[in-house]
Amino acid sequence: MVGSVLCKRLQTLDIPHLKLSRHPSLSSEDQVFWDPDERILETEKLREVETVIHLAGEPVGKRWTHEIKKKIIFSRSDAGRFLFETLAAQDKPPKTLISASGIGFYGVANETKFDEESAKGRGFLADVVEDWESAPEPLHKVGTRVVNMRMGVVLSPDGGALAKMLPVFKFGLGGTLGSGHQMMSWIAMEDLIRAIMFFIENETLQGIYNLVSPNAVSNVEFTTILGWVLKRPTLFPVPALALRVIFGEMAMQTILASQHVIPKKLLEAGFEFQYPELEQALKHCLGREKN
């Protein structure tokens, strides 16, 4: 989802770029075939690449069976590590790696506000993110600048949490999830893409950065604002018990989890959010700015 939007932005700006693809039939001048399961990568096309942006990862928004957990781990840590080890072994490794990560690192806390200096939390996602962020170490060792982006909920009608909510809310069946008090740290897709470009352009930036709006909201606030933007009622709450029964562990660490995360380092670096408030962000991504 993010990769497709980013590629369109790069194309608009006439910035040459290559896309990794798992489909050999799609291999072309701007496509690079790779199969991390079989440890295959078309390295000859990557010799002159200066910046690598790694965004791959199995979606976490489904019940976490044993097999799903294995896919979540492999797609982030193992596949990434294979890519980074291969790139690090080239005669000319890339100058910059910008890699996706997640705010799941911080675990769950009802009262705490997390910034980049906050300690690792507990749970499956916290462990996944810790391993995910260690995967670029081979590139770090050869001098590549590494940026790890701990992303919050990315607002897009084309994928992720918002895309799953929209059909329900449009039918007027939306409502709060659980108590509704849990904090949700989000970022507009436009600001995420702008932040990636910001990291590319500012070569002194490296390390961990939280990619979330400065203004986290509670689930009650999110529900109310989304209903208002769509001009639909939000009268059908979903009990926490139902979510736990349906989604199990995943519900406790995502849907019902409270995470109030602050983009401290990003703001200190001078980044300016175009959509820092939820209402304007939702209106933009849903094409309702004139309403």
Task: Please provide the spans of the model-predicted regions.
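NAD(P)H-binding glycine-rich loop region in Rossmannoid oxidoreductase-like domains
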Residues: V32-A79
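Conserved Rossmann-fold NAD(P)-dependent oxidoreductase catalytic core, especially the SDR/UDP-sugar
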Residues: R81-G123
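Conserved beta-loop-beta element that borders a ligand/cofactor-binding pocket
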Residues: S101, S134-P157
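Glycine/proline-rich active-site loop of Rossmann-fold NAD(P)-dependent oxidoreductases
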Residues: E130, V142-T144, L155-K164, F199-Y209
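C-terminal amphipathic/interface module of NAD(P)-dependent oxidoreductases
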Residues: Q253-N291
